[in-house]
């Protein structure tokens, strides 16, 4: 059995200048509307998530993005503290190294990158580009995975590992959901607690 443990602000019209010195318009995600959601379900230090956002996310019917994992096992780790005063803002899904990491939703692969914190990572968006799904500490990518690839819920994206700042003896998937605000800054959205929205067990499509 798999065990589970546990800024971008809207506004502005321009990003950094292009190589010719001209400002380039920001590519904003779908606009928000309605009342703000309860602050226990997102990180208000990063921006606002509305009740409408959460309703739309719930309608996505996400799967737990690790093969063999179940929603009931997902911990309440979103609010946990981390070093340097950071909040976790994610769910850590423990599984043996090499366990398939699955696409939580239909959507598009937007960025494949490696960094010191997340290690081997994937950024994907839902079909409406309203939400970002971030998968980190991977051991590697699925064969032929590429940017702009369309994926379906339950497709294999990669494999659980310990890359980045993950403990070498604790392979896991760091999974984060963000409300996308700027399409050019996928990493800089508003984190949303994954637990209430992972409704189906991790199974292959």
Predicted regions mapped to residue ranges:
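Zn2+-dependent peptidoglycan hydrolase active-site motif and core
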Residues: 103-147, 170-174
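Generic detector of contiguous secondary-structure segments
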Residues: 55-58, 135-147, 153-162
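Bacterial signal peptide processing site
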Residues: 7-12
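Small beta-barrel nucleic-acid-binding modules, principally OB-folds
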Residues: 89-92, 131-134, 181-188
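Surface-exposed, glycine-biased beta-strand/turn segments
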Residues: 14-120, 153, 162, 192-205
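A generic structural motif
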Residues: 94, 125-127, 178-180
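Sec-dependent bacterial lipoprotein signal peptides
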Residues: 1-6
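Conserved, short, structured surface segments that act as functional micro-motifs
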Residues: 149-205
């Amino acid at each position: 059995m798999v065990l589970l443990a546990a800024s971008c602000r809207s506004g502005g019209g321009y990003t950094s200048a292009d190589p010719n010195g001209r400002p380039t318009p920001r590519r904003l995600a779908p606009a928000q509307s309605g009342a703000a959601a309860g602050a226990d379900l997102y990180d208000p230090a990063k921006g606002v998530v509305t009740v409408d956002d959460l309703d739309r996310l719930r309608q996505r019917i996400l799967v737990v993005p690790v093969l063999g994992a179940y929603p009931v096992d997902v911990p309440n780790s979103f609010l946990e503290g981390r070093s340097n005063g950071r909040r976790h803002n994610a769910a850590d899904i423990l599984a043996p190294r090499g366990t398939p990491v699955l696409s939580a939703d239909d959507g598009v692969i937007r960025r494949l990158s490696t960094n010191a914190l997340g290690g081997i990572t994937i950024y994907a968006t839902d079909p409406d580009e309203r939400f970002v799904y971030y998968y980190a500490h991977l051991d590697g990518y699925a064969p032929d995975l590429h940017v702009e690839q369309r994926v379906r819920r339950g497709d294999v994206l990669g494999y659980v590992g310990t890359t980045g700042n993950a403990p070498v003896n604790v392979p896991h998937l760091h999974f984060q959901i963000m409300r996308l605000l700027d399409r050019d800054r996928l990493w800089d959205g508003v984190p949303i607690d994954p637990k209430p929205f992972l409704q189906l067990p991790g199974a292959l499509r």
